[in-house]
Amino acid sequence: MKQYETVTVVGAGLAGCEAAWQLAIRDIPVQLCEMKPMKRSPAHHTDNFAELVCSNSLRSNELSNAAGLLKEELRRLDSLIVTCADKTQVEAGGALAVDRTAFAQSVTNTIKNHPNITIIPGEITEFPDGRVIIASGPLTSDALSAAIHEKIGKEFLSFYDAAAPIVTAESIDMTRAYLASRYGKGTPDYINCPLSAEEYHAFREALCTAEEAPVHGFEDSKVFEGCMPVEVNARRGYDTLRYGILKPIGLPDPKTGKDPFAVLQLRRDNAQGSLYNLVGCQTHLKFGEQKRVFSIIPALANAEFVRYGVMHRNTFLDSPRLLDNTYALRTEPRIRFAGQITGVEGYVESAASGFLAGLTTALEVQEKSSLIWNRQTAIGALACYVSDHTINKFQPMNVNFGILDPLAYRVKGKREKNNQISARALAIIDSIKERIAL
């Protein structure tokens, strides 16, 4: 068997593990560098790889949803992250949610047991020689950030993500809550906590006036919309919450048969159903304030909080000025970046960037012809978005149909149009799968 050059991957998060896996299964030796367990970022709590620090949901599974399309593309292309997610999923209606501990352990064990992957523990503070994929994440250490800054000659852009609290299932007052999924889709997997107009008013007022934990450099204007702290959301207007994360439409209270004034949904956080997270309630309030404010919700009056929400720094590159559509540094193509540091936002999006970076590097090492990735697939559309030099003010982006090429013909109905875009994408993915078959 031919001996290929070793590729270094920095960071064993979702993107780094996916990149390492795509290289390793193609017989390319990988050095996977991870600073845990020697050092952890402020948002990490375990020594596992691919630790989920925000929600436990990988979002919709439906092909009429761009997140569902992206997962299906990766699933067909033998993604490690999606495979492990499928194995450790918990009930969540039409979404793919996972038992976060089982998921991380599954990824960790798979990576550690592959003979082509060598784990190098410890913090990386400078660029390794040879081909390298930097997947150090949104919480890149100060030392590596300095090395990247010196290499690219550009300033990073920074913002902050927030994680939601988790409560025990047994502490939820089910006499004041009910099980349902919106519009009755799928199985009734969410616990719904209704609020009257008076209760909503009290909850919102408490949110707006609660004391926040100190966060260096935090500014409301820099908060990414997809992971906005609930208290920042509340300040934007009286009805912002009830038209957003507390939207009651499609969730009638079985006691009245009518939609409540507002509803907080709780989503299962582990396979056993013993833990639930507060959907959309990412926060950076002080811990004591979190308990006080969320206990205003009747069903959570006596809730036991096993994890409070935390706020953490997120750092990403001005990628359109730096990267090509394979995530390679234009000025030094031996270097690729992957994951949220590139400006893709979300778990599956991070895995997708790691997949493309790892696969493309593997093809280069093996001196095989490269693939053309365009906006007709979700994987390609993300790569094209982060490398689009026409974007003046670059901001992180979740996958969405707006970044994919539209159809060349008109289709009646948004859902059907999206389904046809997905069908086109998956046909392309199937042809790619044939070309890269192991």
Task: Identify the meaning behind each predicted range.
Residues 3-15:
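Beta1/beta-strand and adjacent pyrophosphate-binding region of the FAD-binding site
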Residues 21-83, 375-386:
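N-terminal FAD cofactor-binding segment of flavoenzymes
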Residues 63-67, 71, 79-92, 152-161, ...:
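A short alpha-helix-loop-beta-strand transition element characteristic
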Residues 73-147:
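Feature captures the FAD/FMN-dependent oxidoreductase FAD-binding
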Residues 113-287, 291-292:
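Predominantly flavin-linked oxidoreductase catalytic cores and closely associated redox partners
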Residues 350-371:
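Internal hydrophobic alpha-helix adjacent to the cofactor/substrate pocket in enzyme cavities
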